[in-house]
Amino acid sequence: MAGRRSRNNDITVDILLRAYSAGLFPMADSADDPELFWVEPEIRGIIPLDDFHVSKSLAKAMRKKPFAIRFNTAFEDVMAGCAAEAADRPSTWINATIRRLYTELHQIGHAHSVEAWEGDELVGGLYGVSLGAAFFGESMFSRRTNASKICLVHLVERLNAKGFVLLDTQFTTEHLKTFGAIDVPKLDYARMLDLAVNRPSLQF
């Protein structure tokens, strides 16, 4: 199924949740692409929730409390921030269909945002999908130094407090590896995923 393309009206939130439970997730080639395709990596990125790393410099920055951190108060704005072009991200895989589908997931309690606020301004955030005891990180953005990093720290704290057992990052990057992200072969990931998604759904 990896790489199979679907027209906009082919995918519902029910199909999307079933895909996540099977280890697949959708992407678009660009924001203007009318189609989605399913991705099933041979090597999957995860952050072990019991081995999350916070650098000394980030911990020092967090002690200054530069942002107010909120959850699920501006989900669509976080998606818009993640979809916006930036100097380090000239294009995006988040198209209108993805924004609609994940907003619907948010409305039924399966997609969530972590937000960094500076006064009344949203300056960073991330969003992802919860299913069972798994959380699938989708994208993040930052308009201030460390904003998305601090959101990630708060996400992990919340997942641990709520009893989640899997934080899926889809792929690893050098940035995520500084937090402890590792690569997991598909078969190993499938076992971890099965254990996580077949638990009763946890409240985020």
Swiss-Prot record:
Its EC number is 2.3.2.6. It is an enzyme of class 2 (transferase). Its main location: cytoplasm. GO terms for cellular component: cytoplasm. It catalyses: N-terminal L-lysyl-[protein] + L-leucyl-tRNA(Leu) = N-terminal L-leucyl-L-lysyl-[protein] + tRNA(Leu) + H(+); N-terminal L-arginyl-[protein] + L-leucyl-tRNA(Leu) = N-terminal L-leucyl-L-arginyl-[protein] + tRNA(Leu) + H(+); L-phenylalanyl-tRNA(Phe) + an N-terminal L-alpha-aminoacyl-[protein] = an N-terminal L-phenylalanyl-L-alpha-aminoacyl-[protein] + tRNA(Phe). GO terms for biological process: protein catabolic process. Gene3D superfamilies: Leucyl/phenylalanyl-tRNA-protein transferase, C-terminal domain. Keywords: Acyltransferase, Cytoplasm, Transferase. It holds the Pfam family Leu_Phe_trans. InterPro entries: Acyl_CoA_acyltransferase (IPR016181), Leu/Phe-tRNA_Trfase (IPR004616), Leu/Phe-tRNA_Trfase_C (IPR042203). The keyword Cytoplasm applies. GO terms for molecular function: leucyl-tRNA--protein transferase activity. It is found in: Cytoplasm. Functions in the N-end rule pathway of protein degradation where it conjugates Leu, Phe and, less efficiently, Met from aminoacyl-tRNAs to the N-termini of proteins containing an N-terminal arginine or lysine. HAMAP family: Leu_Phe_trans. Belongs to the L/F-transferase family. This is Leucyl/phenylalanyl-tRNA--protein transferase. It comes from Agrobacterium fabrum (strain C58 / ATCC 33970) (Agrobacterium tumefaciens (strain C58)). The gene is aat.
